[in-house]
Swiss-Prot record:
This is Autophagy-related protein 13. GO terms for biological process: cellular response to nitrogen starvation; Cvt vesicle assembly; mitophagy; piecemeal microautophagy of the nucleus; positive regulation of autophagy; protein localization to phagophore assembly site; protein targeting to vacuole involved in autophagy; regulation of cellular localization. Its main location: cytoplasm. It comes from Vanderwaltozyma polyspora (strain ATCC 22028 / DSM 70294 / BCRC 21397 / CBS 2163 / NBRC 10782 / NRRL Y-8283 / UCD 57-17). The gene is ATG13. Activates the ATG1 kinase in a nutritional condition dependent manner through the TOR pathway, leading to autophagy. Also involved in cytoplasm to vacuole transport (Cvt) and more specifically in Cvt vesicle formation. Seems to play a role in the switching machinery regulating the conversion between the Cvt pathway and autophagy. Finally, ATG13 is also required for glycogen storage during stationary phase. Keywords: Autophagy, Cytoplasm, Protein transport, Transport.
Amino acid sequence: MAPHNCDRELIDLIHNFFLRSTLLICSSKLNKNQHLLEEIQKFDSDLNEKPDLPKTINEWFHDENERNLPPLVIETLLDLKKLSPNHFVTLRDDDGNVWNVCKGTKKSEIVLERWLIELDNTSAAFQSYRGTIDSTGEIRKQIVLLARYLVTLIQILPSNELEENLTKNSTNLILSLKRKVIDGSKPILSKGRIGLSKPIISTYSNVINERNIPPHLEQRKITPVYTPLGLLRISVSFRHDCRFEVNQSTDSSDNVASNTTNIHQHLEPLHNKNYTNTSLSISPHSHIALASSSERNSIGKKDLNSKPIHPFKTGSVGSCTINQSQAMIRTTSNPSVIATLRAQRSRNDSISCQSQLEDIQLESTSVGSGSKYSSSFGRIRRHSSVKSSENVEKPIRLVKQSNAPTDDLLDFVKMMDEKQELRITKCNISSNNADISNSILRFQKLKSSNEILSEDLSMSVSLEGVNASMHRRSSVSHSPIPSVSPPVQYPSIPSRLSKTNLQEQDTFKTAVVSRRNSVEKSKINISQPKTTGRIENELVDKPLFNEEHESKGEELLASGIIGPSFKRSTSPHSIESVSSLISKTKIAFQQPSYYSHPTTAAVPAYAKLHRPSVLSTDVLSEDQNKKVVQDLNNNKDEDDELLFFMSDMNLSKI
């Protein structure tokens, strides 16, 4: 910090710095005095003689503010107080584009520059300064150098160019530059004026500035001068663009504006009138929008050569006339009448719209494009898109026919109201539609049964040839598994086979073949109750191993009908697959037609059971096994009657 016993000469030098800098900034080009620079250079002269200072800067030279001088702010302003309401201010940028600033009397001034002169004794730069303390003479030399740099900076600022242009152009004397000295320790207000921080050109709002300065501004700083009391600083912030212009509105433009206003005022009642006329067709269910008979007649007799103003260019609403039949339709409350004449009303609208196509061609695009949409709320125009392309060779005759009173049409409406058979027809149609839908549903339900039957037939055909090979393999290996083809859902099979009755065996063959070739018969027979049969063969009692397992295996062979929920995905070569064929109802297994009746012999049975290499557990799902086990438990009582022992059978071919 500066010592207390600071020289008085240093304080006077600092005061003189504030004074001379303020005079340099506030001096204009017209009244530029060369003695200002001379006074700055002669700081070593007698400083005791102070000039008369204005009141705005006199407070910086009091004795109590010798060491703590407040910041001094000088603003360069564009004065707009002389402008009238007919003037408006514009700004031209570097590219020659003109931007509107404000109208006269709206703003009083525009801030162009802001200078800051201060004695900085609190900044870190001053606190950390460790240089040698210069004498008062050295400080004076540095201030003179600073003053020269200040003069150069003032001459290159944009406001200097603006001031020269205003002095050359005598018509712009209403604009002038002025300077204002403000105490920097107090807040600066911009009420009633365009402040320095407000951009006029909107393109600057998209510019990114890394210096934390508004993009429409620039800042310049002069190298400070160090003194024991603080740093003497001068800085300035100014606008890029200062080419302001004043324009005055001419009488011709005022006349054009007044004429435009009169035209808008004249067109408003016309538009309102057209909107009231079109409200008749926009709201078909309203009663207050109906016009009187005289107005309807005047609309019907309107000259076709006249060019009315239509709010809708396509002519679908505004240009269509409304006849008496439409008005009577809206007043009536019978829904059948409205439904009958809705198509007729649409045809009348499209015919009357076509009569004015010649007038609308100059100001409309195409009728077809606008006719896709409804011209009123609550009803659909089904014929407008078709009628718009009809021939328009005789528009006058069509308009007269549409506007003429239609007594025959009213009589036809009354006749249609008296007929009550029309409503019965709708009921018949609805009942027929219901029958058709029910038939379709029934047909769709039959699809699943058809798929099941086709699977049964295909499996029976594919597995029939496997029976012989399976039987031969079982006889050689002494396996208790009999050769049997997978059962098919046949309705009724002879339940008793006798050696003496060969005729029944032939009948069985015929039934099997007929069931394979007929799909419709199998559908009917599936729904019929299935009969159960029991094979009564003469068996020889022999001691067998695993009696319980053999009884279950033979029970599977005895069951011939499978439940409807069963899906044939099992392997025909697996013994586990046979267990899944058990159902509540049981029939005798099918005997191959090319084998003779089975005969029994006293042959000892072997306990060794040959299992197939391929297990069906990989194929069957758990849900199917659960269903089979549940059926076994439920039918335990019935299964006891069908248990029998099976030994090897020697079958001879026919």
